[in-house]
Curated annotation (Swiss-Prot):
Source species of the chain: Caldanaerobacter subterraneus subsp. tengcongensis (strain DSM 15242 / JCM 11007 / NBRC 100824 / MB4)
Protein name per UniProt: Ribosomal protein L11 methyltransferase
UniProt feature coiled coil, ranges: none
MF (Gene Ontology): protein-lysine N-methyltransferase activity
Annotated function: Methylates ribosomal protein L11.
Keywords of this entry: Cytoplasm, Methyltransferase, S-adenosyl-L-methionine, Transferase
Reactions catalysed according to its record: L-lysyl-[protein] + 3 S-adenosyl-L-methionine = N(6),N(6),N(6)-trimethyl-L-lysyl-[protein] + 3 S-adenosyl-L-homocysteine + 3 H(+)
Record localization: Cytoplasm
Family to which this protein belongs: Belongs to the methyltransferase superfamily. PrmA family.
InterPro entries in alphabetical order: Ribosomal_L11_MeTrfase_PrmA, Ribosomal_PrmA_MeTrfase, SAM-dependent_MTases_sf
Length: 309
């Protein structure tokens, strides 16, 4: 299938606003190429390998949006230009805007993001390696092979990174781990490779379940079971660790149901909490749990809890 690619070159400041306009116009997908993201990672120890040419991209942001080819595409492009121009009236510096339109195959845009997804070291030992990249692990490193497809969880997002860092410290040999809202399966796979005896991962989304199962198979793991479930609904038994990297509303709904599924000395790790919702989540969590540790990165928080008493 052919799609129409509309690529907008704009400023760092206007990135979020322009992306919102493209989604409002009905974009079927958006790829954002922001050189600052690359530079930020390159200055840390988290990205062991990257293409140095990515550092030569300048300061402009390129936002590519993909639309089904229709007769009104000219109207969409004109409307887009008008909306971007209007951003100036709100005091947003849009930079030297350029709008380019081209036809692309579905396979091309679906895979275009892969060139920017490289092996990533998270925490002390875990390295997330995309399926299409070569990587030679250093001594003591734990490599997770991953093809995230359309499921959430590549290791690059702050919420996933914080979960992986916590799991390095709390998953003990022989542990039973529940991964609620498993997405790509990255946390389930990490728990297994960190020594868990058995891991149960579930997601409400059928596509995520399919992708997670494929990633478990890709890593050659036989002690990870992936299934479909709305939060803890289809889980059985108790776990030493329950991890949920989901949105704040889902965490609030999940919290009371964690207790009967958690062993007496077990730990509950909740992530995906935006700063603006933290107090709300914290208040609900403290009705049932004692918060023993927290991590914060940019606008996201992760909290580690144990049963009260």
């Amino acid at each position: 299938m052919k799609w129409l690619e509309i690529q907008v070159t704009t400023s760092q400041e206007a990135e979020e606003a322009v992306t919102g306009i493209l989604y409002d116009l009905g974009a079927g997908g958006v790829v954002i190429k922001n050189p600052n993201d690359v530079k930020e990672l390159a200055q840390t120890s988290e990205w062991d390998y990257f293409d140095p040419s990515l550092l030569e991209e300048g300061e402009e942001v390129k936002i590519s949006a993909y639309f089904l080819i229709t007769t009104d595409i000219t109207d969409k492009v004109n409307f887009l230009k008008e909306r971007i121009w209007e951003l100036k009236s709100f005091g947003i510096n849009v930079g030297n805007v350029k709008v380019e339109v081209s036809e692309v195959d579905e396979e091309d845009w679906a895979d275009s993001w892969k060139k920017y997804y490289k092996p990533l070291k998270v925490g002390k030992r875990i390295v997330v390696r995309p399926l299409w990249e070569e990587y030679s692990p250093k001594e003591g490193e734990i490599v997770i092979d991953l093809d995230p497809g359309m499921a959430f969880g590549t290791g690059t997002h702050e919420t996933t990174k914080m979960c992986l860092q916590f799991l390095e410290d709390i998953v003990k040999p022989g542990a039973i781990v529940f991964d609620v809202g498993c997405g790509s399966g990255i946390l389930s796979i990490a728990a297994s490779k960190l020594g868990a005896s058995y891991v149960y991962g579930a997601d409400v989304d059928e596509m995520a379940v399919k992708i997670a199962r494929e990633n478990v198979k890709l890593n050659g793991l036989e002690n990870v079971e992936i299934f479909q479930s709305d939060l803890l609904k289809n889980f059985r038994g108790k776990a030493d660790v329950i991890v949920a990297n989901i949105i704040a509303d889902a965490i609030i709904r999940l919290i009371p149901d964690v207790l009967p599924h958690l062993k007496e000395e077990g730990l509950f790790l909740a992530s995906g909490i935006i700063k603006d919702r933290f107090e709300e989540v914290k208040e609900r969590a403290e009705e049932f749990f004692e918060i023993i540790d927290m991590k914060e990165e940019k606008e996201w928080l992760s909290i580690l809890m144990k049963k009260k008493g």
